[in-house]
Amino acid sequence: DVDKLTADKMRAAYWEKYGTSLAGLMQNHQIDPEDFLNVVHDIDFSVLSKDLNLSNSLNKLPGRKLVYTNGTAPYAREVLKYRGLTDVFDEIYGIEDAAYVPKPFPEAFEIVFSKANIIHRKSAMFEDEVRNLEVPFKLGLKTILVSDVQSNKKYVNYSVKCLSDFLRQITSNSFN
């Protein structure tokens, strides 16, 4: 057992070094990933609200739509359910689908993109963590950072604050 301050420091250090705090716990403390994720993902999803605008905007995009998260696929499904986005996505991939290797590591993308049959030059990656866009960019995907903190990194094609607004812009043909 560790105190909260020590736990927070460990979490931040593991996230920085290993991509997720889970990966650091697995590496340094032999934590079972399924046990850990079952505990941290046991949350109240009812605080989330449906987002009809986002659903409509996503549905206007051509092609397959996938979710790839450093959380688990079941966790992502719950989030999507409470956000009213269940029927928008064709496939959902979680960290378990990458053998618990997290984004931003190249192996994680290689595993998931291979399973999903991603055609790199015809795909885009939307991500809220800038460091998770470098590998997809190098693979030839268009990269979109969705965050209040904007980025001018060379591997970020677009940096936007609001995903719904961005999608509305590109699907209305007013996109430059």
Segments (PLM) and residue ranges:
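N-terminal helical cap/lid subdomain that shapes the substrate entry/recognition surface
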Residues: 1-53, 74
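Catalytic-core regions built around general acid/base machinery
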Residues: 53-62
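Short, contiguous strand/loop micro-motifs
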Residues: 8-10, 41-45, 63, 96, ...
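Asp-based, Mg2+/Mn2+-dependent phosphohydrolase catalytic module
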Residues: 34, 59, 66, 72-73, ...
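Residue-level signal for alpha-helical context at structural boundaries
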Residues: 28-29, 43-44, 54-55, 94, ...
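Short, surface-exposed alpha-helical recognition segments that flank or form part
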Residues: 45, 49, 67, 100
